[in-house]
Amino acid sequence: MAKLLAMILAGGEGRRLDPLTRDRAKPAVPFGGRYRIVDFVLSNMANSGILKMKVVVQYKSESLNTHVQRAWRLTSLLNQYVELVPAQMRVGPKWFEGSADAIYQNLNIITDEEPDFTFVFGADHVYRMDARQMLEFHLDRKAELTVAAVPIPVQEASEFGIIEVDADGRMIGFVEKPQSAPKTIPGDPTRCLASMGNYLFSTDALVQEIVRDAGDPSSAHDFGKSIVASMYQRKRVYVYDFARNVVPGQTERERGYWRDVGSIDAYFQANMDLVAVDPVFSLYNDEWPIFTVQYNYPPAKFVFNNESDHRVGRATDSLVSEGCIISGSHVHHSILSPKVRVNSYATVDESIVFENVNIGRHCRIRRAIIDKHVDIPAHTTIGYDHEKDRKHFHVTESGIVIIPKGMRIEAGR
């Protein structure tokens, strides 16, 4: 049986997710109520039976470190692990200078473990994937590198690294964020193949390419721009079409679902994908669960049923986590993390509320993201007057209001 190792790149700063990433790395941003973004790649590896994972961290990693240590305790008796790898400056007094450099500075991990194949996956996307199927494709093609790719509309090509393939799936071209005339999928002029930032290497090839790149002073030391763009011209590089990946318990509608949540708007929409009656991405797949930390909180509670007084505790088309109290208020099309309290006569609509937030009486909240440890005074209105909101909060062009972690909001604002 082949020896497998997963190197998870989780050091991303996530500037486009500011202010959610002011105090945490992008993979540590909460998602779907009770998860962190990093849980999706780790769950995919665990469900695929790949149980040796190194999580490479750097930027503001305390929150991420704490989460991984609490949530991802595999058994050392069977030599299974999820271990954090901080920047150690093993090759000199410098931080990681790119995704490829993050692997180069930790090559000792790979050479010590001696895997036959090494997965190098990002930690900032939302999806389900059976990585074993990618391995089977890699072996079948006798590839030295396999790049996972997802079909996207031609109109979105400028946001991704776009791959050109031949009829057998071998990479014959790669352009990072093309601004015009992107190469399309053979036989389908309406779609392109976008790199997912997930790679599978035959380990000998990985070591050779990483060392080669490290010795090039002109390199950006980035997997897409540097490793992939160079390697496909010299070695056997194939492209695995993620749309062909089949996960147990997955609906046909969910197949091929993959979201880059690197911007506020994309992050918001991916969360909203979860709350429909028939969601395009379901958290309720017991055959391929998303694992996370288990909280010791009581169940969610809904109190008051005074219809005549409009004081009814209810939530519709929403995800409400453990420890929440919906007290005579209405939550609709929203996601609440643990220990959120929504007090009487308040309404929360199409919003994402992080842990330990208190929403006062008669508040009206719409299309907002509220970070942790925020107390919203009674009668506060957010999301209904963007000009007013911009004086106090961050508001995106699409009208999403973000309230940073721990922000103090004055009564009568």
Swiss-Prot record:
GO terms for molecular function: ATP binding; glucose-1-phosphate adenylyltransferase activity. Alpha-D-glucose 1-phosphate binds at residues 161, 176-177, 195. Keywords: ATP-binding, Carbohydrate metabolism, Glycogen biosynthesis, Glycogen metabolism, Nucleotide-binding, Nucleotidyltransferase, Transferase. Its EC number is 2.7.7.27. SUPFAM superfamilies: Nucleotide-diphospho-sugar transferases, Trimeric LpxA-like enzymes. One of its GO terms (biological process) is glycogen biosynthetic process. InterPro entries: ADP-Glc_PPase (IPR011831), ADP_Glu_pyroP_CS (IPR005836), GlgC_bac (IPR023049), GlmU/GlgC-like_hexapep (IPR056818), NTP_transferase_dom (IPR005835), Nucleotide-diphossugar_trans (IPR029044), Trimer_LpxA-like_sf (IPR011004). It comes from the Bacteria. It catalyses: alpha-D-glucose 1-phosphate + ATP + H(+) = ADP-alpha-D-glucose + diphosphate. Pathway: Glycan biosynthesis; glycogen biosynthesis. Belongs to the bacterial/plant glucose-1-phosphate adenylyltransferase family. Involved in the biosynthesis of ADP-glucose, a building block required for the elongation reactions to produce glycogen. Catalyzes the reaction between ATP and alpha-D-glucose 1-phosphate (G1P) to produce pyrophosphate and ADP-Glc. Homotetramer. This is Glucose-1-phosphate adenylyltransferase. The gene is glgC.
